[in-house]
């Protein structure tokens, strides 16, 4: 059976492995838990979905909704949505898919359902090839041999790890816009007519109320993207 190393446990890595045939797969993750940037932040009794807010029902990935429901990772909610708050667009009801216990439930439950061993808190610093086999190195450990290695990580991290295998000179580097995320809690309900929407102001592109996803805290929490 082929031995496969997968670096990263974000949604791209988990989706990839979910669609592979039965192989000897080992995950490597620099963080302490799976999920990558699909995370849920906790502070005292508050919960904030940070990095991704929800899944659209019509995202186009065939079979995903049914599978996530089967592994009890998600729930479907209806919320009041405004497409352009600043321009006073009409508020409409919109159905979205959210995590059972925060958006992190999606990667956590998907990772658990795969059942493959994972080396957490293991940042791969070097990838070596010897006699058509691959070895992975952290600061103090070496793993291998592997027949194949899948790197599921942001471009900059992949370039640092794979520049001895891939000529990046002819590959255009992606350019990203910075998004700032603010997680804020109020000691009372604000009575907002919507739960989520776009363009509150020229500087606030999106915001979402966390209470309609997590009704077990009494104060009001919002995640704001700028």
Regions found by a protein language model. Give the residues of each.
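Central helical "cap/lid" subdomain
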Residues: 35, 143-195
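Short beta-strand to alpha-helix junction loop
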Residues: 54-62, 87-109
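Conserved SAM/SAH-binding loop
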Residues: 11, 52, 121-125, 139-141
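N-terminal FAD cofactor-binding segment of flavoenzymes
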Residues: 19, 39-82
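Glycine-rich FAD pyrophosphate-binding loop
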Residues: 7, 19-43
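Active-site substrate-recognition segment that forms the wall
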Residues: 183-226
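Beta1/beta-strand and adjacent pyrophosphate-binding region of the FAD-binding site
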Residues: 1-12
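A conserved short coil-to-beta-strand element within the FAD-binding core of flavoproteins
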Residues: 120-134
